[in-house]
């Protein structure tokens, strides 16, 4: 018995009696005479496949356009974030510079502030002492 990959047992099909590779109405296959090639025949009655293919081409075109728009939006967002990051780095450098200047200014004039606070406290205690003496009589 010759070996045919599409037949098994008593001449029955592996596909339960259906022609192999049959996917929908209007499509049928048959083996070419004496070869392993398969011929596909489309019934003219079911010619809506061309319309479906055209519709699929349209959907593919739409998906391609959407993918391109997503790519351009991603590039725009990446450029925006890069620019924002550079602005943030410049702002951080400016803040660090100003804090450094402020710290140096505090260190230079810090002793005078402490002296002023001490003198103010002594003055307040002196005024309170004098006031308490005046109203004690």
Curated annotation (Swiss-Prot):
It comes from the Eukaryota. Residues 135-137 are vesicular. One of its GO terms (cellular component) is plasma membrane. GO terms for biological process: protein transport; vesicle-mediated transport. Residues 1-113 are cytoplasmic. The chain crosses the membrane at residues 114-134. Keywords: Coiled coil, Endoplasmic reticulum, ER-Golgi transport, Golgi apparatus, Membrane, Protein transport, Transmembrane, Transmembrane helix, Transport. SUPFAM superfamilies: SNARE fusion complex (SSF58038). It is found in: Golgi apparatus membrane; Endoplasmic reticulum membrane. It is a single-pass type IV membrane protein. Residues 43-105 form the t-SNARE coiled-coil homology domain. Belongs to the BET1 family. Required for vesicular transport from the ER to the Golgi complex. Functions as a SNARE associated with ER-derived vesicles. This is Bet1-like protein At4g14600.
């Amino acid at each position: 018995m010759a070996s045919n990959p599409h037949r098994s047992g008593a001449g029955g099909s592996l596909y339960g009696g259906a022609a192999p590779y049959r996917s929908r109405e209007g499509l049928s296959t048959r083996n070419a005479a004496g070869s392993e090639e398969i011929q596909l025949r489309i019934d003219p009655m079911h010619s809506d496949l061309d319309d479906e293919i055209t519709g699929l081409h349209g959907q593919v075109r739409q998906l391609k356009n959407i993918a391109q728009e997503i790519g351009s939006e991603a590039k725009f967002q990446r450029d925006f974030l890069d620019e924002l990051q550079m602005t943030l780095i410049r702002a951080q450098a400016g803040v660090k510079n100003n804090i450094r200047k402020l710290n140096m200014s505090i260190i230079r004039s810090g002793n005078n502030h402490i002296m002023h606070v001490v003198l103010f406290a002594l003055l307040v205690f002196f005024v309170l002492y004098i006031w308490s003496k005046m109203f004690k009589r």
